[in-house]
A protein has these predicted regions:
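Conserved active-site neighborhood of enzyme catalytic/cofactor-binding cores
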Residues: 213, 223-230, 236-237, 243-288, ...
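Soluble non-transmembrane domains of integral membrane proteins
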Residues: 508-599
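Extended, highly charged clamp/arch subdomains and adjacent linkers
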Residues: 2-85, 93-123, 135-146
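Membrane-interfacial loop-to-helix junctions in multi-pass inner-membrane proteins
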Residues: 29-51, 112-134, 195-216, 241, ...
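Membrane-interface interhelical loops and short amphipathic "cap" helices
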Residues: 1-9, 32-37, 59-93, 145-173, ...
Length: 670
C-alpha cells in the first residue's frame, strides 16, 4: 500500500499542477490578478504531495521492500542504512522524483513568500513553474514510474552500484538538483516578467535570491562531486571533462553570468533583455544536462538511463520549454526597454565583459561536449578530451579571473581610466612579483597554462581583497565581505589547479611487503596485506607507513575491495593530507610473482581546489544573507537592513504597517 499511496500522491500533484496552470491562464486572460489567492494554496498542496510521495519512496528503500522494482534493482537487504537512504536517488526514477519534489517545494516557497512582485507577474511566474512541473510529472508517470511493482519480488535485491556506495551520494546529487531547480525558478520569473511586460529592477530583486541560492548549491555540488570522484575512482584526477561533468559545469557558468547580470539590473536598472536571455540559457543548460544523463547516449558512472525513449521525452520537453521561451522573448522583446545607461569605463562594462567571457567558455564547453555525440550519430567517432578544453577554454577562463578582480575596483555608471589604473597598481605589482618568483623557481619545467595560473592567482588574490582597503571593516556590509570571499576563493582554487598541474609527481611500482618506495621526498613502507570485511564487502588492505624527512611514520591503508551485490571490484585510495599537499596511494592487483601494483602521487596544494570552492559558496551565502532585498517580510514581521549601519545591524519592525513605514522612511533618510 505504501507504493500505491506514493503513486497516488504523485498523480494528485500532477492534477494540481494542471489546475494551477488553468487558474493562472484564466486569471491572466480575464485580467483577474486577484485569482493569485486561489493559486497559492494549490501550489502549496502540490509541494506537500510531492514531499509525501518522495518520503514514501524513502520508506520503501529503508524497509528493503523488494516488491517494488526500483528497490529490487537498486538496493540490497544487507546494505547499510545510509546507502539505502541515499540509494533512493542513486538511480534514474528516484532521482527524478527528488527533482520533482524539490520543484514542488520551490513552487510552494514562491507562492508563500514572494511579496515584491506585482500580482499579475507573480501569478504568471507560478503558471510557468506549473508548466515545467507538469512536464516532469508526465515524464515520471508515463516513462519512469518509481513505484512500479516487481513480479516476482527477489529476496534480497541486486544492490547499488558500489562506486555510489559512499557518503558523497547523500550530498552531491541533492545539491545539484536543488541548484537546477533554482534555475528553473529563475526561468519562471523571466517568463512571468515577459508575459506581463514587467522587466525592471523590482523583478530583478525578486529573482536574484533564487539565482544566488541556485549558484551556491551548484558550486557546492560540483565541488563535492569533484572531490568524490578524486578519492573514489583512484585515478588521481579531480576533473576529467567527462560529458556529464560538463553537464553540471555548463549551468554553473550560465548561472555565474546570470548572477552578475541580474545584479546590474537590480542595482542599476540596466541589461534587462540580456538578463532575461541568460535566465533562459541557464535553465536550458540544466535541461541539456538532464538529457545527457538520462537519454542513454552516454555510458558513465554519472549516467542513469539506457532507454532512448526517455531521451526523446526529455528532448521534447527541452524543445517545448526553451523553444517556447525563446519565441516569447522574440515576441515581447520590443516591449523590454533598456534602463539606465552607463559609460565605457564603469563597473557595468566590466560585468558585461565578465558575461561575454563566461558565455564564450560556455559555448566552447558545449561544443566540446556535444560534437562527439553529433559525429557519432553520423557514424564517425571523435574523441574530445582534456587537451581541447585546457587549451581552448583555459586561456578564456584566466581572462575571466582577471576581469573578476578588476570589476569591484571600478565605480558604477562612470569612472576614469586613470583612477582605475591607480586602484589596480598594487595587484599589478604583486602579479609582476609572482611572475618573477615563479620564473625563477619553475621556468621551463611547467606548462604555460599552469605558469600563468600561478601568476594570475597571486595578483587576483590581492585584487580580490582590495575593495576592503581604506574601509571601516566594522561598517562594511555583509554582502561586500561575501563578494570578497567568493572572488578570493576563485584565486585559491586557481592556485590549487595550477599547482596540481605543474608539480604533481606520480610513481607506479610493483612491490612486495617489506619494500620501501621513495618519491617526492616521501618514503612509503609496504608492511603487509590484511584481509578485512565490511557490512557488504570484503577487502585486501595494504598496511603501509608514510614518512617525510625526520617526521614520524604515519599509517595509511589503501584497499582493494570486492562487493558481492552486484559483484564488483573497486579501489579505496589512502589519502594523507598535509599543509602543502596530499599523498595519494592506490593498491592495485597482485601479480603472479607475489608483487602488488602500487601507484603513488604527491599532489602539492591540491586541496586548495576544494578549499576555494567552499570559499566561493561561503561568499555566496554571505551575499545572500546580507544583501538580498535588504529586508524580509513574512508572517507580518518586517526586517530591513539599514545600508549605512555596521555589518549585521538589523532594524526590526513590528507587525503593523505603520511600523513598517517608519523603518522604510529611516532607510530612505539614511
Amino acid at each position: 500500500m505504501i507504493a500505491e499511496a506514493g503513486l497516488a500522491a504523485l498523480w494528485l500533484a500532477a492534477a494540481l499542477a494542471f489546475l494551477q496552470l488553468g487558474l493562472v491562464w484564466f486569471g491572466l486572460t480575464t485580467d483577474k490578478p486577484e485569482l493569485l489567492a486561489s493559486v497559492r494554496p494549490v501550489a502549496v498542496a502540490q509541494g506537500v504531495l510531492t514531499a509525501l510521495s518522495f518520503a514514501l519512496l524513502v520508506t520503501l528503500f529503508l524497509r528493503s521492500d523488494m516488491s517494488v522494482a526500483l528497490v529490487a534493482t537498486n538496493s540490497h537487504s544487507a546494505k547499510p542504512w545510509l546507502y539505502k537512504f541515499a540509494g533512493t536517488w542513486g538511480n534514474h526514477e528516484g532521482s527524478m522524483l527528488l527533482w520533482v519534489m524539490v520543484m514542488g517545494i520551490a513552487g510552494m516557497a514562491v507562492a508563500l513568500f514572494e511579496r515584491a512582485l506585482r500580482r499579475d507577474t507573480h501569478m504568471a511566474t507560478l503558471g510557468a513553474q506549473a508548466m515545467i512541473s507538469l512536464g516532469f510529472y508526465a515524464f515520471l508517470l508515463f516513462s519512469s514510474n518509481p513505484f512500479a511493482r516487481a513480479n516476482p519480488a527477489p529476496p534480497d535485491g541486486q544492490g547499488l552500484n558500489p562506486l555510489l556506495q559512499d557518503p558523497g551520494l547523500a550530498f552531491h546529487p541533492p545539491t545539484l538538483y536543488l541548484g537546477y531547480v533554482g534555475l528553473s525558478v529563475a526561468f519562471s520569473f523571466a517568463v512571468g516578467a515577459l508575459l506581463t511586460r514587467n522587466v525592471d529592477a523590482v523583478f530583478a530583486r525578486a529573482m536574484r535570491p533564487w539565482i544566488l541560492a541556485a549558484w551556491i548549491l551548484l558550486t557546492l555540488g560540483i565541488t563535492a562531486g569533484s572531490y568524490w570522484a578524486y578519492y573514489e575512482l583512484g585515478w588521481g584526477g579531480w576533473w576529467f571533462w567527462d560529458p556529464v561533468e560538463n553537464a553540471s559545469l555548463m549551468p554553473w557558468l550560465a548561472a555565474t553570468a546570470l548572477l552578475h547580470s541580474v545584479t546590474v539590473l537590480a542595482t542599476r536598472d540596466a541589461l534587462r533583455a540580456w538578463t532575461i536571455m541568460l535566465a533562459v540559457v541557464a535553465f536550458s543548460m540544466s535541461m541539456v544536462g538532464t538529457f545527457l544523463v538520462r537519454s542513454g547516449i552516454l555510458t558513465s558512472v554519472h549516467a542513469f538511463a539506457v532507454d532512448p525513449e526517455r531521451g526523446t521525452f526529455i528532448l521534447g520537453l527541452l524543445a517545448l520549454y526553451i523553444g517556447g521561451a525563446l519565441a516569447l522573448f522574440g515576441w515581447r522583446i520590443g516591449t523590454v526597454r533598456e534602463g539606465a545607461q552607463f559609460e565605457l569605463v564603469s563597473r557595468e562594462t566590466m560585468l558585461v565583459v565578465n558575461n561575454l567571457l563566461l558565455s564564450v567558455i560556455l559555448g566552447l564547453v558545449l561544443i566540446g561536449t556535444l560534437y562527439p555525440l553529433m559525429t557519432e550519430a553520423f557514424g564517425h567517432k571523435v574523441s574530445v578530451g582534456p587537451p581541447y578544453f585546457d587549451r581552448i577554454a583555459g586561456p578564456v577562463a584566466l581572462a575571466v579571473v582577471i576581469a573578476m578582480a578588476a570589476g569591484p575596483l571600478t565605480r558604477w555608471r562612470k569612472d576614469q581610466a586613470r583612477a582605475v589604473a591607480g586602484r589596480l597598481l598594487v595587484p599589478a605589482i604583486v602579479l609582476l612579483l609572482a611572475f618573477a618568483v615563479v620564473s625563477v623557481l619553475a621556468w621551463g619545467r611547467i606548462g604555460v597554462l599552469p605558469f600563468l595560473g600561478l601568476v594570475i592567482a597571486a595578483g587576483v588574490a590581492v585584487g580580490s581583497v582590495a575593495p576592503l582597503w581604506k574601509r571601516n571593516l566594522r561598517r562594511t556590509p555583509l554582502f561586500t565581505y561575501g563578494m570578497v570571499i567568493a572572488h578570493l576563493g576563485c584565486a585559491v582554487s586557481l592556485a590549487g589547479m595550477a599547482a596540481d598541474s605543474a608539480f604533481t609527481v606520480e610513481k607506479l611500482v610493483a612491490a612486495r611487503p617489506g619494500d620501501v618506495i621513495e618519491t617526492a621526498g616521501w618514503k612509503v613502507r609496504f608492511d603487509a596485506i590484511t584481509p578485512i570485511a565490511g557490512d557488504n564487502w570484503t577487502a585486501l588492505q595494504g598496511d603501509m607507513t608514510a614518512s617525510r624527512g625526520s617526521g614520524s611514520p604515519i599509517d595509511i591503508h589503501p584497499q582493494a575491495r570486492f562487493f558481492t551485490a552486484p559483484p564488483t571490484n573497486t579501489t579505496e585510495a589512502a589519502l594523507l593530507t598535509r599543509w602543502d599537499g596530499q599523498l595519494y596511494v592506490v593498491l592495485g592487483q597482485e601479480a603472479d610473482d607475489g608483487r602488488w601494483q602500487v601507484r603513488i602521487w604527491w599532489k602539492p596544494f591540491v586541496t586548495l581546489i576544494w578549499l576555494g570552492g567552499m570559499m566561493i559558496a561561503l561568499g555566496g551565502t554571505l551575499s545572500l544573507l546580507g544583501r538580498e532585498r535588504r529586508g524580509y517580510k513574512s508572517c507580518g514581521v518586517v526586517l530591513r537592513w539599514r545600508p549605512h549601519e555596521p555589518l549585521g545591524d538589523l532594524v526590526a519592525a513590528g507587525v503593523v504597517s505603520g511600523l513598517f513605514r517608519v523603518v522604510r522612511e529611516r532607510a530612505v533618510e539614511a
